[in-house]
Design a protein with these regions (language model features):
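Conserved G/P- and acidic residue-centered "switch" motifs that form tight phosphate/ATP-binding loops
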Residues: 103
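Active-site-proximal beta-strand elements of phosphoester/diester hydrolases
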Residues: 202-205
């Protein structure tokens, strides 16, 4: 099994010290099964070698991708990463690979599916909760309510869960082919999944990798790994059939 971790350059430089890396290892992955990737890898990246993709947090998605101009000074974009990840997502979807999105990853997935974002929550809305917490990243600050009992998220949690909150943007208009599976108490989208038949596409607005010591948050990564191992088994089966032929 091999999983691509699409991260910011500074996160990639952390290697095995990255919280994403550590969370997946804690959930049962081996370090050899994980490969951090970023835009400079685009020329040689072969998705045939992977069984799942995690889209991590980081910079804001360029508003041009959802038909808007940048309106606020605190919107910090990385166009190269946007282009790289949208192509990576497109190819992963074509191959029906398991996909996990976290924070920016959730927003990027929504935009790729035709949705839009609040460019800055404090400017575009009047949130009742603090969505960019000042405390430790490993602290939970508010609850999210699960909205779809048939979702993978609902099968992982029971009714609601407490999360950290480290974002100044959020989903505004939902992308086509996605469904909301959780929202915050003030109505913001906190999680989405594929609305149609797809092996596994889950994206959450919070940062579960910073909460991986909590059993319920670790289950998100365990579920993702399970789906990746299933994809790996299918790939091995196809390879075996090809050799027999």
């Amino acid at each position: 099994m091999k999983i691509a971790l699409s991260v910011a350059e500074k996160e990639k430089a952390k290697g095995a010290d990255s919280p994403y890396f550590k969370a997946l290892v804690a959930a049962g992955a081996s370090s050899e099964e994980l490969e951090p990737v970023s835009p400079p890898d685009s020329r040689h990246l072969r998705l045939d070698d992977f069984d799942g993709v995690l889209f991590a947090g980081g910079e804001d998605v360029d508003p041009a991708f959802y038909g808007e101009e940048k309106r606020y000074d605190n919107v910090n974009v990385n166009r190269a990463r946007d282009e790289f990840e949208m192509l990576l997502l497109e190819r992963a979807l074509d191959r029906r690979l398991p996909i996990l999105g976290i924070c920016r990853g959730t927003q990027m997935i929504n935009v790729k599916f035709g949705g839009t974002l609040y460019q800055d929550l404090a400017s575009d809305t009047t949130p009742e909760l603090e969505h960019k917490q000042r405390g430790s990243r490993s602290e939970t600050t508010h609850a999210v309510t699960l909205t779809d009992p048939d979702s993978d998220l609902a099968k992982t949690f029971q009714g609601s869960c407490r999360v950290n909150s480290l974002h100044h943007q959020a989903i505004k208009r939902l992308g086509h082919g996605l469904k909301v599976t959780a929202h915050s108490e003030d109505g913001l989208v906190e999680a989405v999944e594929a609305a149609e038949d797809y092996p596994f596409l889950m994206a959450v607005q919070w940062h579960p990798e910073e909460l991986a010591d909590l059993p319920e948050q670790r289950k998100l990564f365990e579920k993702f790994l399970l789906k990746c191992r299933e994809a790996s088994s299918r790939r091995a089966g196809r390879a075996g059939q090809g050799q027999k032929a």
